[in-house]
């Protein structure tokens, strides 16, 4: 998995990064209700599961934007991953804990969901935090799910994570409202590399995908 270092001296975003990383360290979050009214019947007709399909949709939009693939390597250099893969949580009902797995991102939805099913079968019953540890040099971003609550806002406190630049997502329980089905999705980003413009573009792209999702069929 490639990691392309930026030329920090000529990077147009350098003053913004230095302000929000060094002078005023700043993470911020935004929670948006994604309208999945059209998505759900398409999923039912396709035979695909909801959770891996939404993980794929989020991953597609993250990989579409270099600003959402930015990270710092072990030397502190800033760069952009050629591809980032999603980690996601699997809940264990027996002891009420969870494990973190990952599945390699690929553009094809059905192929991704097949890989997700295989990873879930292989690692999903391992009761430890990282049931599938990351590979060396791998770019990973986080998705978690809280299917027991439909929240309006969610923010994570990350006091020691100022060098972590990749986005973090949390899914809530979807709900019916005024005839629509809405999925709360919280997105937390580092302001050093991600502005409101990038967050807005992500959600607009994700909504367009949820409205059409042509790869699922009619």
Predicted feature residues:
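Helical lid/core segments from catalytic subdomains that handle acyl or acyl-like groups
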Residues: 92-149
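Gly/Ser/Thr-rich phosphate-binding loops and adjoining beta-strand/alpha-helix segments
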Residues: 2-6, 21-53, 68-86, 99, ...
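Acyl activation and transfer enzymes in specialized metabolism, enriched
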Residues: 39-64, 183-202
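Intrinsically disordered, low-complexity linker/assembly segments
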Residues: 157-188, 192, 204
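Active-site cores that bind ATP or allylic diphosphates and position pyrophosphate for catalysis
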Residues: 152
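Flexible helix-coil linker/hinge segments at domain or subdomain boundaries
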Residues: 208-218
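Catalytic/RNA-binding core of pseudouridine synthases
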Residues: 10-14, 60-61, 65-83, 87-100, ...
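Plant-skewed but cross-kingdom recognition/interaction modules and surfaces
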Residues: 119-131, 135, 165, 169, ...
